[in-house]
């Protein structure tokens, strides 16, 4: 049996007690500045039926811009209005921000002044240093910058108060349109701003990103990798610097050369997430205090003396007494951009240097190689010019590589391709993208510490077809990278959502199962160990890792650490050579052909169709007398009536009356009378709605009633399904776990895909993810009825049917 998942425990995002128990805790990612709650989303596989009534198609930026110019009005964004709803969702703030357009804030506003660069970014009073650190990295790659920030925008030519920015969003690029109203206090920007008072590209980019996630507050706290990926569509690798490879400097250098984005941070040993208020202090009052203390003089373009005071300037994120700045000037729990690597000749020796930037635009490293370090005088003047050394408080500074790896704990690298940074070769990689979801009670099975449910997680077959082209490597190996990303958790924070702890495992598929797209069952995972897996389960938006495995067929199982956690994800697989990656989906089918009893016009026709038969006109019900005289024996029955059959006949006669047919109310009485005599089956009986569905299943002439023969057919089915139910009701509670419903449905001869299993769970499980006997039978009745109806219409057997509106409504309304 595979071993239990073990994972190292990284610093937690908040001060909270560990849960007791033998299962090892997953690693926790240190979100740079905030926390959140936890909630399950609402999933419906048939939500698309509501799409036509949601609204008209969104207009493009060009259409909106043109319309505003024609009407000579300034654009106001109805989806992200300039009011409190776009700012914060958790509480009402005690001060009121004034929304102003740039021409109302200053004279001669400009979108970009002398090119967008990293010194244009100064953090405001929102805990989104992770986002701003990524912007600083983005400015180092002009090609990427122009993709995210279209430069044909202006406050002068064709100005209409409308701007747009582009972000990579879960596999596709989206255009986010905003108005240019920005929150201010005392006529100063509250959030991100530029060193130039009249430059606004960074503030507007932040607003567009806030709209993408639902509010400004949603940007509070995160990891730099999130924004890096949203700017590039790249794939991120995450390094714990203390456990990093010996050639880390080489890796960082190659990242710079290839245009990769890099960020770093220092774990906060206080267990307080940076950017959150201390216990007992209201966050609204805290930010209000900060905003009121903003020093307007900081917005002048004149240089500031960085050594004038040991106190941090008043334009801060948190009050000085709550900051986590160290004596060396670095800040714990804070995101920095890595903006350069170099080497300098110092006293006859080469010294490796790293250039970093604090998104605050101030508060810098004060050790060796800092701006004001006295030994810069020993460096050649031309070298200093090449390194752009300046004594300015702009948040950017140099430090030695040795000091960097000593003080910093995390390094995040967003690669624009999946090429390994240890390699000197650039490859053309193939990528496959699969979207999926974990649905509570059906496909949210948790990690392999939970063997009863792990197998229910979504599964993705990966076929590695060709080995790598590496003449120096004698192994027959395929290199690939797997990246699992959870979707929309930040946007759903206002609903209580937080990042799940996620990871994945990779299993090799036995040769005899190659090409078989069936979902691997529980026993497979009980007796087969994984060939590879993510290094750890961690609460980051994306988990990625490189692997080298022989050509073969594998299955990737993405999961949350705990079961029953519902969410969406995308799974990306990058490989040097051709690969095939697709979700495992069972073929929808039913085991044995059953008589198809269904007509397209119930009111006027009386047809009974078989799977391999032509329809027979005029074949209807026999009279009650004939049915009673010569009942058709059921499979497995003897000629002589059993005690149960005699009991049925007597009860049926008592309830049915002279016409020997029963309606839904009468069927309920018959079934519940018989079921109650089965003491080994705990059930509250059948509901009227279930009985109506049963009649719809067995009714051959649209009368809305069942005769004795039809009732016998129905009861035999219920008995067969009852055996399946009792098999999975292991604790004899009268319910089965929704995760077992997949196997129960399969045992009954119905083979469905993952989407249909999800629908069954949503439709028939209770809030505890249990399914009682009545719901169980009702589900099977509906399944059999739908399969019968489909086969009745699928006259040519090609698996496709065409219905007119009358047939469709008849099919769905009487079922």
UniProtKB/Swiss-Prot annotation:
GO annotations of cellular component type: cytoplasm; cytosol; myofibril; nucleolus; nucleus; plasma membrane; protein-containing complex; T-tubule
UniProt-listed Enzyme Commission number(s): 3.4.22.54
Amino acids binding Ca(2+) 1: 656, 659, 661, 666
Bias type Low complexity, positions: 629-639
Main EC class the enzyme belongs to: hydrolase
Pfam families in UniProt: Calpain_III, Calpain_u2, CAPN13-like_C_EFh, EF-hand_8, Peptidase_C2
Compositional bias ranges of the Basic and acidic residues kind: 616-628
InterPro entries: C2_III, Calpain_cysteine_protease, Calpain_domain_III, Calpain_III, Calpain_III_sf, CAPN3/13-like_C_EFh, CAPN3_PEF, EF-hand-dom_pair
GO molecular-function term, one example from the UniProt record: peptidase activity
Keywords: Calcium, Cytoplasm, Hydrolase, Metal-binding, Nucleus, Protease, Repeat, Thiol protease
Record: residues binding Ca(2+) 2: 699, 701, 703, 705, 710
Family: Belongs to the peptidase C2 family.
Function, as annotated: Calcium-regulated non-lysosomal thiol-protease. Proteolytically cleaves CTBP1. Mediates, with UTP25, the proteasome-independent degradation of p53/TP53.
Protein name: Calpain-3
Organism: Macaca fascicularis
Lineage of producing organism: Eukaryota, Metazoa, Chordata, Craniata, Vertebrata
Gene that produces this protein: CAPN3
């Amino acid at each position: 049996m595979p071993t239990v998942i073990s994972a190292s425990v990284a610093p937690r995002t908040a001060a909270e007690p560990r849960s007791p128990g033998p299962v090892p805790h997953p690693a926790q990612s240190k979100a740079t500045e905030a926390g959140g709650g936890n909630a399950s989303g609402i999933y419906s596989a048939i939500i698309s039926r509501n799409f036509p009534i949601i609204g008209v198609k969104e207009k493009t930026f060009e259409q909106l811009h043109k319309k505003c110019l024609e009407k000579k009005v300034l654009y106001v964004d109805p989806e992200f209005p300039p009011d409190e709803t776009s700012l914060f969702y958790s509480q009402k703030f005690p001060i009121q921000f004034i929304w102003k357009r740039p021409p109302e804030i200053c004279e001669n506003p400009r979108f970009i002044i002398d090119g967008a660069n990293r010194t244009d970014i100064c953090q405001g009073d929102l805990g989104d240093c992770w986002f701003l650190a990524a912007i600083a990295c983005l400015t180092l790659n002009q090609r990427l910058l122009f993709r995210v920030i279209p430069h044909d925008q202006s406050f002068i030519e064709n100005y209409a108060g409308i701007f747009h920015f582009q972000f990579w969003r879960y596999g596709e690029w989206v255009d986010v349109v905003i108005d240019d109203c920005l929150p201010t206090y005392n006529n100063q920007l509250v959030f991100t701003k530029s060193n130039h008072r009249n430059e606004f590209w960074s503030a507007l980019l932040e607003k567009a990103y806030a709209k993408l996630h639902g509010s400004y507050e949603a940007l509070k706290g995160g990891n730099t990798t999130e924004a890096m990926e949203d700017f590039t569509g790249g794939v991120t690798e995450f390094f714990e610097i203390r456990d990093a490879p010996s050639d880390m400097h080489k890796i960082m250098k190659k990242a710079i050369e290839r245009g990769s984005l890099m960020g770093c941070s220092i774990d906060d040993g206080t267990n307080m997430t940076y950017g959150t208020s201390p216990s007992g202090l209201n966050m609204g009052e805290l930010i209000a205090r900060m905003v009121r203390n903003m020093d307007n003089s900081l917005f002048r373009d004149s240089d500031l003396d960085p050594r004038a005071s040991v106190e941090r300037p008043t334009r801060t994120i948190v009050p000085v007494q709550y900051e986590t700045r160290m004596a060396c000037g670095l800040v714990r729990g804070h995101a920095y951009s890595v903006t350069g690597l170099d080497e300098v000749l110092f006293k006859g020796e080469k010294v490796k240097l790293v250039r970093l930037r604090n998104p605050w635009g101030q508060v810098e490293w004060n050790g060796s190689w800092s701006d004001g370090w006295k030994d810069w005088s020993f460096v050649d003047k031309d070298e200093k010019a090449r390194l752009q050394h300046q004594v300015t408080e702009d948040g950017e500074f140099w430090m030695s590589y040795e000091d960097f790896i000593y003080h910093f704990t995390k390094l995040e690298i967003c690669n624009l391709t999946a090429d390994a940074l240890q390699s000197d070769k650039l490859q053309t990689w193939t990528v496959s993208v699969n979207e999926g979801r974990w649905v509570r009670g059906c496909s949210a099975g948790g990690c392999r510490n939970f063997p009863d449910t792990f197998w229910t997680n979504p599964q993705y077959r990966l076929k590695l077809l060709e080995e790598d082209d590496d003449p120096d490597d004698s192994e027959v190996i395929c290199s690939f990278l797997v990246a699992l990303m959870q979707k929309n958790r930040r946007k759903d924070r206002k609903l209580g959502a937080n990042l799940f702890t996620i990871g994945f495992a990779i299993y090799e598929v036995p040769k005899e199962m190659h090409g078989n797209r069936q979902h691997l069952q529980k026993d497979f995972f009980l007796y087969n160990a994984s060939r590879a897996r993510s290094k750890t389960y961690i609460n980051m938006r994306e988990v990625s890792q490189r692997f080298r495995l022989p050509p073969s067929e594998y299955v990737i199982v993405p999961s949350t650490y705990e079961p029953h956690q519902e969410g969406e994800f995308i799974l990306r697989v990058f490989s040097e050579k051709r690969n095939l990656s697709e979700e495992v989906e069972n073929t929808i089918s039913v085991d044995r052909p059953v008589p198809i009893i269904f007509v397209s016009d119930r009111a006027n026709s009386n047809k009974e169709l078989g799977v391999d038969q032509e329809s027979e006109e005029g074949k209807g019900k026999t009279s009650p007398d004939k049915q009673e005289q010569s009942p058709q024996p059921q499979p497995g029955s003897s000629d002589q009536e059993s005690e149960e059959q005699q009991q049925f006949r007597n009860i049926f006669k008592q309830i049915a009356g002279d016409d020997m047919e029963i309606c839904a109310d009468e069927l309920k009485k018959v079934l519940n009378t018989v079921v109650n005599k089965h003491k080994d089956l705990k059930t509250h009986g059948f509901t009227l709605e279930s009985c109506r569905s049963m009649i719809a299943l067995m009714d051959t002439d649209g009368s809305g009633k069942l005769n004795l023969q039809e009732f016998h057919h129905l009861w035999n089915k219920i008995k067969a399904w009852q055996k399946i139910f009792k098999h999975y009701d292991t604790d004899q509670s009268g319910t089965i776990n929704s995760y077992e419903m997949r196997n129960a449905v399969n045992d009954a001869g119905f083979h469905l895909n993952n989407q249909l299993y999800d629908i069954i769970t949503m439709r028939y499980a209770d809030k505890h993810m249990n399914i009682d006997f009545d719901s169980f039978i009702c589900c099977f009745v509906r399944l059999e009825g739908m399969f019968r109806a489909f086969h009745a219409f699928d006259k040519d057997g090609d698996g496709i049917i065409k219905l007119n509106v009358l047939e469709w409504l008849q099919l769905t309304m009487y079922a």
